[in-house]
């Protein structure tokens, strides 16, 4: 049973506003961690990870949870396990979703990914541009297309073994 123990368990997230489910990959690669990790509403941390030092770096006003996840995985070697079912029902409309905070979030994302992924970030930024990331973001946020988009993404994760 010990091979199934993790420091962080994460499941899928139902987005009520879009009426769709974010299906996260089984394996969190550098590329996945650059794009975005499972949101904090879908994560369950071993208590020790939250008791170490200060769990959240509050200099990150929007992305403290993202930085904490990457710190646990990259610096502390936390093991993760994906639970292939929905664990959170997210209503939407959170603090990070208004225009000013979205800009701050993008800025903090650049700082955090550079800190943990180093120069790999340039490759991943280029990949996001080439794969039309802004268009994918619009599809994912659309009530009309979100369900289809997330089903396709889950299928790609499944066939690619991620």
Q: Where in this protein do the model-derived segments appear?
A:
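Conserved nucleotide-sugar donor-binding catalytic segment
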Residues: 11, 15-108
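A short coil-to-beta-strand element that immediately follows conserved catalytic motifs
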Residues: 8-9, 83, 123-124
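Residue-level signal for alpha-helix termini/capping positions
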Residues: 1-2, 74
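Membrane-proximal basic amphipathic "stem/tether" segments
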Residues: 114-162
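A short, conserved acidic/glycine-rich loop-to-beta-strand motif
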Residues: 3-13
């Amino acid at each position: 049973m010990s091979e199934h123990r993790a420091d962080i368990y994460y499941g899928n997230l139902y987005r009520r506003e879009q009426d769709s489910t974010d299906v996260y990959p089984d394996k969190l690669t550098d590329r996945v961690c650059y794009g975005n990790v499972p949101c904090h509403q879908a994560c369950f941390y071993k208590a020790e990870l939250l008791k170490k030092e200060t769990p959240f770096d509050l200099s990150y006003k929007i992305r403290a949870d993202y930085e904490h996840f990457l710190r646990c995985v990259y610096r502390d070697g936390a093991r993760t396990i994906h639970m292939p079912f929905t664990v959170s029902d997210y209503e939407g409309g959170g603090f990070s979703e208004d225009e000013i905070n979205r800009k701050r979030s993008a800025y903090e994302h650049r700082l955090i990914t550079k800190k943990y992924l180093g120069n790999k970030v340039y490759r991943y930024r280029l990949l996001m541009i080439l794969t039309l990331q802004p268009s994918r973001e619009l599809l994912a946020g659309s009530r009309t297309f979100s369900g289809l988009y997330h089903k396709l993404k889950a299928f790609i994760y499944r066939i690619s073994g991620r």
